[in-house]
């Protein structure tokens, strides 16, 4: 999107370190680096390398927006907030040698007339999914662990549906489309209009949504008719007390079985998200959670411990209590970085590993998806992928938190010739 916001006379190249090594010797006038917390350390290394070569560097993204003073030590300018409305001015300031140290988004930018992302900059054949699109931005909820609210505020903005459809028309419709919205149905009225507009295009798509989508039969029916293959649902926990503590008011544990049944009745698969190790969790959480996910026959699921990202209520409360054990951001991708309340770190780490292994065991996979008729091959393939991936991953995570682990996070930068 930043490339699409760049004036057309500026030459843009994109590098994703997961795919291609960065050429630090390439002639470049300006470098833009996007950083999340888990990529911040490597992002700073990239910035420092370019600056040492005399290249101006811009840092943006959730992490620099949350900790601009930290980020400014590694950049010539820091963008706080969303890029729309800021980026063209920044480019002009750079051209006239008037680059400011900080560019802050004062108001939430309009989503009207957003440019089409420049997908042609992606390395060809390097990504399994290139049909990514967003129709909305933000989330109407304010969960304590979520960095979306701290970055975007508790707002929910929608793009004009005709502009979303115009972008859909630029995608390869035979391939799966992924809506990267934080909650595709955060505004049910808008979602219904969007799904109606999608029906003629006969695409297949997946997206994130809250359990609230199951409370509207017409909305679910339209989602299925428009090509929805799966919904990624944040159940988070099967403890009502935990839901209250994390501010997930949209969820009601007693409704979960009915929610799952209703979504599945429309032929839509469910990928469930669960958090293990919340302050109300004891060692029973592992057995209870995996049994629930198996008994509900969830097609796929992820099980994570809380990650206290800077700027979130979770981070602030744990930091105030002295329970954060490291602020080495490179540890935040795969390691337990806080002290659990009702169990030891070792118990939480081993318990989560056990949940993953049990959920993706061959008997569990067969029980959950073996009798499905729709998308059986795809769902079975995803299960086997998770099984292989996490078995490898957990073998590499047996070291303690304080150990020196390699950084294996996405690192993306844009190079600009002005």
What are these regions (language model features)?
Residues 11-14, 93-94, 313-316, 322-418:
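Radical SAM enzyme core and accessory elements
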Residues 5, 9, 49, 53, ...:
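Alpha-helical structural signal in soluble globular domains
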Residues 70-89, 222-232, 288-303:
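Structural recognition of alpha->loop->beta junctions
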Residues 1-171:
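Acidic, low-complexity intrinsically disordered segments
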Residues 116-273, 291:
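Radical SAM [4Fe-4S] cluster-binding motif and immediate context
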Residues 28-32, 37, 194-198, 202, ...:
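Short, electropositive alpha-helical surface patch
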Residues 58-59, 79, 102-103, 206-208, ...:
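Structural detector of well-ordered beta-strand residues that form the stable sheet scaffold
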Residues 68-70, 189, 241-246, 276-284, ...:
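Flexible glycine/acidic-rich beta-alpha junction loops that bind and position SAM and/or redox cofactors
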